[in-house]
Amino acid sequence: METDRKWIIVRIDGKIAAASTDYRLLASISSYLAEQGRRQEKKIRPGKPGNTKGCIFSKITAEAIGMDELWELRHKTGWEDLMLFGTDFQKKVWHKLWELTHAYVRTTDEDNAGSDTRDGHGYQKPEDLTLVSYSDFAELCQNRAGVRAVAHAIGLNPVAVIIPCHLVVPKESIDKIREINKKAEATIFKGDDLCISSILNDSSIDFGEYSCGRELKRELIIRELTGSWS
């Protein structure tokens, strides 16, 4: 399965800056930080090369982990645990993506009155987790007229899975799923996870582009909606 591959987690001073299936984002971030350091150096000591103390970050690390570890990390990660590099618009889109699986819900637990809970880590996963079309997601971002700009920002998401860009798919895919599901309503498998998994595995359903590959996007969607891998 595509999910058997290793994931590279990049951290800067302990905060997650990237999650990907290769080292390209590590190289990109390292290059960006080096450039920022050079600019900072010029501000501190203009015209005096050799100063390397301008970098505003002290440590960048990368580790390879498995899919299950990444899934667990996703449930432990708060928005404040991320360090994202991008425009304000991109960060707005990424935050809205993050909210698809990390929505804040007020608890009714008397022992934790007024606090926010989710899987024991300060947030709660929404019960009605589902796929979202690009146009509907653009509306969530209050930018329905700018679907292409929103889609472009989604494609640049540096922290795959933790920021679940795989949940945004073409509207045609959602319509196709509903059509197949409607036919399944009449069967004894109605609502069964096996039936849902079979529908999501249907090769006629195209879930769209994904930076880590189309097949992996399908497997991540199946995990999200059924709780198990394909």
Label every PLM stretch briefly.
Residues 1-144, 182-200, 204, 215-230:
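Basic nucleic-acid-binding alpha-helical/helix-turn surface characteristic of O6-alkylguanine DNA
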Residues 145-160:
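Regulatory, non-catalytic segments
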Residues 152, 166, 218-219:
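Extracytoplasmic/periplasmic beta-strand context in beta-sandwich domains
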Residues 161-170:
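Short Lys/Arg-enriched helix C-cap and helix-to-coil transition segments
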Residues 175-179, 208:
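Glycine-rich, flexible loop motifs
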Residues 208-214:
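Catalytic-site neighborhood detector that most strongly recognizes the C-terminal catalytic loop/helix
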